[in-house]
Amino acid sequence: MQIALAPMEGLVDEILRDVLTRVGGIDWCVTEFIRITDRLLPATAFHKLAPELRDGSRTRAGTPMRVQLLGSDPACLADNAAFACELGAPVIDLNFGCPAKTVNRSRGGAVLLKEPELMHDIVAAVRRAVPSEIAVTSKMRLGYDSPDGALDCARALADGGSAHVVVHARTKVDGYRPPAHWEWVARVAEAVRVPVFANGEVWTLDDYLRCREVSGVEDIMLGRGLVSRPGLARQIAAWRDGGEIREMPWSELLPLLRDFWLQARRKLAPRYAPGRLKQWLGMLTRTYPEAVELFARIRRESDCETIDRLLQVSFSQAA
């Protein structure tokens, strides 16, 4: 059984990957997608979204990182995948699930679920282009506006050479609205001969256990649930290993929140850093009442030094 951290554009960047993997329980993580159009990208484009390539493709906690590509041109994706491997990517993941309209309009992500033959050709081209010891994997949704083609899409990926398939148990049109249709993950798992990971609407350990029961799949990829409850992967891993299952208290999260902010201040432009903190803190309000109070204090602030002072007060009060 494996527990993975999902790739989420504009959310799970290098900073959040670093912080979340240090909590524990995550077996591997994936970069935000690197968009491939009609040319070979320079190394700087890969290092921008996957700086861990310079550190053995691992986060500071030692968690392996995989590089995700998104596009619709099999040959161009293959060339860029091969180059990513030269830069140190240990696994190439292919995105067939992004629901963003801007991405879909440029023929990327979930819109490709309308074309299973092209999905097959993309995976096959990338599989041929990268060294045999490097796995090619894929992530899909159940379909564009209906799950009727889910099995054909999954078979296309597996037959093309995908070592496993992650299934976000919703269609593109569903977006992120509940429920996740875990019963369709079970159907996909029966249709292909490669491992299948379930993804979608797992916010708690109990959710994971229900997902496992309904889907028959034990491997899980956690997205918003893990961002909102950073100890979730650790809880699932403890359940798997027969260890102690405990909640992550706010006092344990605070040092990570502080480090997240310090990294954001150092690595992002001043106009972007506050938004990233508010984004994560806003998601933490789902789990932590303390996050609700802290979010209320900073939500209208855009000056980094002001936020520094407000955070320091909050951290001091919690100590």
Swiss-Prot record:
SUPFAM superfamilies: FMN-linked oxidoreductases. GO terms for molecular function: flavin adenine dinucleotide binding; FMN binding; tRNA binding; tRNA-dihydrouridine16 synthase activity. PROSITE patterns: UPF0034. Its cofactor is FMN. The keyword NADP applies. It comes from the Bacteria. FMN binds at P7, M8, E9, Q68, K139, N199, G200, E201, G223, R224. The keyword S-adenosyl-L-methionine does not apply. The active site is at C98. InterPro entries: Aldolase_TIM, DUS-like_FMN-bd, DUS_fam, DusC, DusC_C, tRNA_hU_synthase_CS. Its EC number is 1.3.1.-. Pfam families: Dus. It catalyses: 5,6-dihydrouridine(16) in tRNA + NADP(+) = uridine(16) in tRNA + NADPH + H(+); 5,6-dihydrouridine(16) in tRNA + NAD(+) = uridine(16) in tRNA + NADH + H(+). It is an enzyme of class 1 (oxidoreductase). Disulfide bonds: none annotated. Keywords: Flavoprotein, FMN, NADP, Oxidoreductase, RNA-binding, tRNA processing, tRNA-binding. The record marks R35, N95, Y176, R276, K278, R299 as: Interacts with tRNA. Catalyzes the synthesis of 5,6-dihydrouridine (D), a modified base found in the D-loop of most tRNAs, via the reduction of the C5-C6 double bond in target uridines. Specifically modifies U16 in tRNAs. Belongs to the Dus family. DusC subfamily. PANTHER family: TRNA-DIHYDROURIDINE SYNTHASE, TRNA-DIHYDROURIDINE(16) SYNTHASE. This is tRNA-dihydrouridine(16) synthase. It comes from Pseudomonas aeruginosa (strain ATCC 15692 / DSM 22644 / CIP 104116 / JCM 14847 / LMG 12228 / 1C / PRS 101 / PAO1).
